[in-house]
């Protein structure tokens, strides 16, 4: 499989998924939109992954490329039916590109927190092998407030009703992070917007908490990756 990866910050890449892709002889190209990279045509790609980032989906004036990115996601998912995976901002962009709504969260989620599968999520192939409730890393202050028509909510948390979503048989997204590596928190904490959300000493506390859960995070990531590939391979 040849995957097109959209990134919005150099340090917010596919993380541990990269090692799984290399191991399994898949290939991928990345485009760094926040650095002014142009969006190439989707021809020749078998799937689209959209990663996280510090900007919000409505900040088109500050980040004009967001409009073109949303159009590309609509083309990829709704018209071409390409397999899709979106994380954090990528989750929100999928929702808005397909007609849903994203807004500021009433309560921001930052840190290691629990997510619970919905009944639909527990029955979904993408979450096969995962427990009904699991720990994950959250780092967001916006969320999907209305899913697009035809979407199904697969997971929720106390503060966020749409933690994971499926649209059609081929498109999946999650508000929470599953791509973590040992240096992820340190690297992301260098982004001013993320550092501000953490507050004084927050990066060190989050890094320690993430390290304590890293084995479980990585196991979950591999299971989700395996499931996604089985569905879309």
Regions of interest found by a model, annotated:
Residues 2, 83, 133-135:
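Residues that mark the start of a beta-strand
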Residues 1-78, 197-233:
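N-terminal beta1-alpha1 cap of cysteine-dependent amidohydrolase-like domains
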Residues 170-171, 175-210:
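C-terminal helical/coil "lid" or tail adjacent to the Rossmann-like core of SAM-dependent
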Residues 3, 28, 84, 171-172:
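Hydrophobic anchor at the start of a short beta-strand
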């Amino acid at each position: 499989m040849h995957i097109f990866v959209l990134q919005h910050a150099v340090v917010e890449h596919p993380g541990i998924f990269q090692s799984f892709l290399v191991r399994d002889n898949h290939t991928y190209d990345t485009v760094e939109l926040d650095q002014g990279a142009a969006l190439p045509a989707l021809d020749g790609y078998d799937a689209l992954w959209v990663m996280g980032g510090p900007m919000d989906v409505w900040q088109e004036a500050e980040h004009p490329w967001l409009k073109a990115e949303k159009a590309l996601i609509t083309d990829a998912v709704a018209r071409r039916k390409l397999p899709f995976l979106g994380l954090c901002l990528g989750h929100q962009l999928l929702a808005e590109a397909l007609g849903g709504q994203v807004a500021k969260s009433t309560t921001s989620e930052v840190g290691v927190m629990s997510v619970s599968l919905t009944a639909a999520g527990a029955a979904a192939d993408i979450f096969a092998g995962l427990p009904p409730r699991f720990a994950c890393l959250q780092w967001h202050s916006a969320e999907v407030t209305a899913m697009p028509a035809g979407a199904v909510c697969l997971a929720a948390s106390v503060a966020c009703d749409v933690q994971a979503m499926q649209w059609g048989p081929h498109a999946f997204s999650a508000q929470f992070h599953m791509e973590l590596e040992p240096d992820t928190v340190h690297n992301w904490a260098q982004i001013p917007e993320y550092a501000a959300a953490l507050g004084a000493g927050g990066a060190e506390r989050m890094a320690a908490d993430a390290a304590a859960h890293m084995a479980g995070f990585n196991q979950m990531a591999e299971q989700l990756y395996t499931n996604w590939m089985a569905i879309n391979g």
